[in-house]
Every structure is written in C-alpha cells, then in structure tokens.
Amino acid sequence: MATNTNVSRVQEDGRKVKRSVYHRMRKEKEASEPIVEARAVTKYVRISPRKARSMANSIRNKDISEALQILTFSPKKSARILYKTLMSAIANAENNFGLNAENLYVSEIMVNEGPRLKRLWPRSHGRADILQKRMSHIYITVRDKSADK
C-alpha cells in the first residue's frame, strides 16, 4: 500500500501539520497578500458562445475605459451582455476590494458553453428538426495595472 505524503504539509522539524491547521495557515497567508483582482460571473445567458466569444476577444487585455468604449458602440447583442458583466466586475473591484477603476484592465475573459434548450421545428411531410438554443457562461476578471509591474 502506497502512502500519500504532501510535502507542503510537513513542517521544518519533520512533523506533519493537521489538515485544519494547514488550511488555516494557507488562508492567513492568502489574506496577508493584497487583493489585486475582482471577478464577475454571468451564467445561463441566452446567446451562442461562438457569437459571444468574438466580442470577448476584442476586449481581452484592454484598459477598462477602452473596453467599455468598444462595448458601448458595438451593435451586437453580446456587447450589451458583456458590458453589464464588465460593469459588475468593476463594481466588485471598487466596493469589495477598494481598487481604483482607472487602474484596472480586463485580465481574463472566458465564454463557456452552458446547457442547451432543445426545441422541435416542424418540417414538411410530418418530419421535425431539433433546434438547439444555446446558452453561455461568462467569466470576467479585472486586475490592477500597478500590481503587475
């Protein structure tokens, strides 16, 4: 029987740390580091991920002001949805973590596929096709520019 030893849970003197103590120590270490990013998630949006990704690629790694300008003047449906999610991420950064909105940029943006609604579409001669209405999950992370330097 093989033993599974986690090297990071062993102290300098060779003693193993209890799991609860290890997790508390890890949380304290993470809490001491300054938070430089904020996230916003929008799930089950009724838009095809393929169509939403084209707009998401245009604002990736852009400054917040530039990304908002691109989304504001775009006529696409995905731009309106991404605008709301980006505004939520900015609000999370300002209100929850005290970050300045002028120093933020879009560090990460993902559009994943959600569940599909399947509907029947009547066709000729008594047949039917399946119409798939796709959904998307959108994840946006904004980071502080000064923290990356």
UniProtKB/Swiss-Prot annotation:
InterPro entries attached to this UniProt entry: Ribosomal_uL22, Ribosomal_uL22_bac/chlpt-type, Ribosomal_uL22_bac/org-type, Ribosomal_uL22_CS, Ribosomal_uL22_sf
Keyword list, A-Z: Ribonucleoprotein, Ribosomal protein, RNA-binding, rRNA-binding
One cellular component term from this protein's GO annotations in UniProt: cytosolic large ribosomal subunit
Biological process according to GO: translation
Pfam family, one: Ribosomal_L22
Molecular function via GO: rRNA binding; structural constituent of ribosome
PROSITE patterns named among the record's database cross-references: RIBOSOMAL_L22
Stated family: Belongs to the universal ribosomal protein uL22 family.
Protein name, as recorded: Large ribosomal subunit protein uL22
Native source species: Petrotoga mobilis (strain DSM 10674 / SJ95)
